[in-house]
């Protein structure tokens, strides 16, 4: 019976560790640097002008997408906010502003 309980405890600990590695556990934040610690994802505002209601709250980015960006048109107005692995390249008559902290593309 003790062996069964020990085996169950080991399985639970392994599963909890795997959940944290996958980002399914509770997100840890370094309060001093105001940055997520652990799972490799960012927290950015993700929307465009048509879905600007979605810009009220930041969303978790896909894994390894830690760069937040804001794409501006030639008139200087933002058109798209999102996250990427690397800073995207601006097209003709566009400007991109990238940042690397959680929720930093809220402008």
From Swiss-Prot:
Gene Ontology CC annotations of this record: extracellular region
Pfam families, alphabetized: Toxin_cobra-type
Expression (tissue specificity): Expressed by the venom gland.
UniProt-listed SUPFAM superfamilies: Snake toxin-like
PROSITE patterns: SNAKE_TOXIN (PS00272)
Top-level taxonomic group: Eukaryota
Maturation propeptide residues: 20-34
GO molecular function: toxin activity
InterPro entries to which the protein is assigned, alphabetical: Snake_3FTx, Snake_toxin-like_sf, Snake_toxin_con_site, Toxin_cobra-type
Record key words, sorted: Disulfide bond, Neurotoxin, Secreted, Signal, Toxin
Transmembrane segments: none
Signal peptide range: 1-19
Disulfide feature: 44-68, 47-55, 61-83, 87-98, 99-104
Compartment annotation: Secreted
Similarity comment text for this entry: Belongs to the three-finger toxin family. Ancestral subfamily. Boigatoxin sub-subfamily.
Quaternary context: Monomer.
Cited function: Mammal-specific neurotoxin (tested on mice). Not toxic to lizards (tested on geckos).
Name of the protein: Sulmotoxin 1
Native source organism of the sequence: Spilotes sulphureus
Organism classification: Eukaryota, Metazoa, Chordata, Craniata, Vertebrata
């Amino acid at each position: 019976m003790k062996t069964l309980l020990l085996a169950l405890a080991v399985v639970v600990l392994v599963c909890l560790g795997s959940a944290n590695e996958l980002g399914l556990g509770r997100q840890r934040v370094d309060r001093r640097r105001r940055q997520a610690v652990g799972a490799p994802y960012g927290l950015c505002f993700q929307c465009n002008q048509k879905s600007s209601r979605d810009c009220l709250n930041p969303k978790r980015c896909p894994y390894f997408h830690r760069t937040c960006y804001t794409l501006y048109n030639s008139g200087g107005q933002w058109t798209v906010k999102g996250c990427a692995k690397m800073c995207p390249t601006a097209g003709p008559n566009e400007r991109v502003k990238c940042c690397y902290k959680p929720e930093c593309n809220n402008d």
